[in-house]
Each structure stands twice: as C-alpha cells, then as structure tokens.
Amino acid sequence: TVAAALESGAITGNEHYQCNGSLEVGGHTIKCHSYRSGGEGDVSVQDSIAWSCNVALMKIAATMGKEEFAKFQQIFNFGLKTNVDLAGEARTASLLFPVDQMGSADLATNSFGQNFNVTMIQVASAFCSIINGGNYYQPHVVKKITDENGNVIQEDNGTLLKKTVSSSTSELLKQYLYATVSDGTGKYAKVPGYSMGGKTGTAQKLPRGQGNYLVSFIGFAPVDNPQLLVYVVVDEPNAEEEFHSTFAQEIAKGIFEETLPYLNIYPDEDIVVTEETDPAEAPADGTTDVPDSAPEDSMVDQTPDIAEETVPPEDGLQPQDV
C-alpha cells in the first residue's frame, strides 16, 4: 500500500495521520490493534509500517483511490501466476476484488492485507522487487545444476520481467522496513550485528471465537544491499495466545543466524545488547496489547464478504494460500 501510494504520487512520505484506534468507513467501524488504548496518536508514513497502524494505512489507501490500488496489485503480480518452476501453481485472480466491485470498506481492509488472498511466492517475489530497487525477477527454486565434477550444466542468472517501483521508492521502503525491525513490531527477529528490515503479519482465522491465528514475518538483510530474504508463516502457534507475530519472528531469527554466516554475509552494524523478551509476553502484532482484549473483535464490526476459512492479515503482507 505504501509503496503504491508513493509510486503513484498520492503521498510523498512526509505525511502524518491521526490514529484514534478506529475509523468509520462505509458504515463499518474498522479498528487498529491499539484501539483499546486510544490509538497510536500521530503516525508518520514510516510509523504506519513500523507500528502496523491500520488507521494510517486506510487513510493512505483512500488518498490513493481504488483504481490505483488495484493497478498496483497487478503490477506486483498479485492474482497472476509467477510461473515459478514448481508444479501446480494456480491463478488467484478470483481472490482479489475487481476494481468495479471494490467498495470503500473493501479498499480500507485491503490496505492492511485483509479480504484478499495471495500466495507466499507472490509475496516474496513482490517484496524482493520493493527492496532491490524495483526490479521484479522471475522466481526460481534452483539456481544452478552441476555435474559430479562441479561443472555447471544449467544456471539461472535471473530474468528481469518488469519494474514495479522506482529506486527512490525502494530506498524509502527499505528505510521504513528497517525501522520495523529496529524499533517496531519486528524487533524480535533482529540478529545482533546485522542491519535488517522486515514486516510482520497477523491473520485471524474463522470462526474468530476459537482464537486461532496464522502469524508471519518476512525479512531481509543487510539493508543497504539485500542478499537474503526469509519468509516464515506459523499456522496456529502452539501457545495459549496464538496472535503474537513473535512466534514467526523467532523462527526467522534462527534462520538468519545460521544462514548469514554460511553465505559469508558479514555483520555491518555494532552489536547492541538488549534484554530478551519471551514471545508469549510481547505485544501482539495487529492485536491490542491490553490483556483483556478479545482477538475476535479486534478488526471490523459487521465485516462483509469474509472468506469461509480465514481472514487475511490485518497488518501487512498476506501469508495465506500456502
């Protein structure tokens, strides 16, 4: 949403928004994760990502309009096959709102990832283009094939398919995603010594009363020259309270810790020692951190047209349709 708004010229990145915890859109009260505490207050464009502020994202999408929003969904290849070299990839066009059927409430909830579905490979491919300067490459599973002597038989050097955003928009998004990991909802994925960026996700699953969630984290390192992207989704974490995205962050952190040295990617930041927090005690991403909060009503009152099995994430990139 933010990348599309910046690229379309709907925002400059200098805007600020007031979050009082909820927003009335199309006859519906759509809530932010901080609604029980009165909202986030003054929220910058960077904060809308770093803090996962639904209200700010809804206002950004409204400024952009549904036509531009739908156009950029297609630019990022949502609803289209990626043609990754794996069998069975399905089209997901029917899981997105056509622009002529997208109402104001649909646009509002779509702005933070609810009410449309994309695959993990679609998310990863689009996300890579956002952080690499705007270049969307054909995704592949295997980089190269060698014989028993190490001779390369076949190698994929990357096929550039299109440009999604400008290099200036990409630089801004990397800055915002860096803030998410350094001081936002993604700080539990931080590996000491490495500059990292990322985004958290929290998806409510129906029926909401059962308190089941799908949580995710997508992150990259290092920030200036991204070399590694990790995307983790945890379906119904084995915990009393499932809605903490920190469960996915902890897994992602472990992968980063093992993989960065293996790839000879060296630390690029000073190590700062911080106090560890148990993921189960951390504030939920996309859900209020007030203990008496009921996850089942943390999103939309009278939500229309919700999928039968899951509700897409209320705060970020869509981890469904695995």
Regions flagged by a language model, labelled:
Residues 3-234:
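Beta-lactam-recognizing serine transpeptidase/beta-lactamase-like catalytic domain environment
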Residues 18, 314-317:
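Short A/G/S/P-biased low-complexity tracts
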Residues 151-157, 249-309, 315:
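Short, gly/Ser/Thr-rich active-site loops of penicillin-recognizing serine hydrolases
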Residues 167, 171, 246-254:
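Short, well-ordered alpha-helical segments
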Residues 227, 239-241, 262:
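Intrinsically disordered, low-complexity acidic/polar segments
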Residues 235-247:
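A short acidic/glycine-rich loop-to-helix N-cap element
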Residues 319-322:
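Short, solvent-exposed mixed-charge patches
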